[in-house]
Amino acid sequence: MRTVVQQVREASVSIGGELHSSIGTGLLVLAGISRDDTADDLAWMSRKIPNLRIFEDEKGKMNRSLKDIGGALLVVSQFTLYADASRGNRPGFSESAPPELARVLFDRFVESIRHEAGCPVETGVFGADMQVSLVNDGPVTIILESPKKP
């Protein structure tokens, strides 16, 4: 599993020009599911993200987590995180999970991170054409990948 985690002052998802979901201060998580991901990958990522100490403390050091600041999460599925553009100019997506599997795993991930984070969690709509808006704070952007299997 691969995620792009962005610290935001606000973020939202619109679909067809209509606001679908939004958060204030917190994290926007773009989540990619690979064809090899398992429940272990989802659990690892669900524990990692809410506990990342990427928010500044009173001394200006990245020392506070989402849980510490009482922030929110906006989680958006993004299969293009597994794009491979190493050959040619059109990316391939053979590493991405097939849509049926990705939907199931994404829903489980959202459930799991809701439980782990204990904060408001909003989402996009799996497979929809979404417009994602954000005000990046910092900017702080972290790319996470679940540990490789032996």
From Swiss-Prot:
A motif (Gly-cisPro motif, important for rejection of L-amino acids) lies at residues 138-139. Its EC number is 3.1.1.96. InterPro entries: Daa-tRNA_deacyls_DTD (IPR003732), DTD-like_sf (IPR023509). It is found in: Cytoplasm. Keywords: Cytoplasm, Hydrolase, RNA-binding, tRNA-binding. It catalyses: glycyl-tRNA(Ala) + H2O = tRNA(Ala) + glycine + H(+); a D-aminoacyl-tRNA + H2O = a tRNA + a D-alpha-amino acid + H(+). It is an enzyme of class 3 (hydrolase). It comes from the Bacteria. Transmembrane segments: none annotated. One of its GO terms (cellular component) is cytoplasm. One of its GO terms (biological process) is D-amino acid catabolic process. GO terms for molecular function: D-tyrosyl-tRNA(Tyr) deacylase activity; Gly-tRNA(Ala) deacylase activity; Ser(Gly)-tRNA(Ala) hydrolase activity; tRNA binding. An aminoacyl-tRNA editing enzyme that deacylates mischarged D-aminoacyl-tRNAs. Also deacylates mischarged glycyl-tRNA(Ala), protecting cells against glycine mischarging by AlaRS. Acts via tRNA-based rather than protein-based catalysis; rejects L-amino acids rather than detecting D-amino acids in the active site. By recycling D-aminoacyl-tRNA to D-amino acids and free tRNA molecules, this enzyme counteracts the toxicity associated with the formation of D-aminoacyl-tRNA entities in vivo and helps enforce protein L-homochirality. Homodimer. Belongs to the DTD family. A Gly-cisPro motif from one monomer fits into the active site of the other monomer to allow specific chiral rejection of L-amino acids. This is D-aminoacyl-tRNA deacylase.
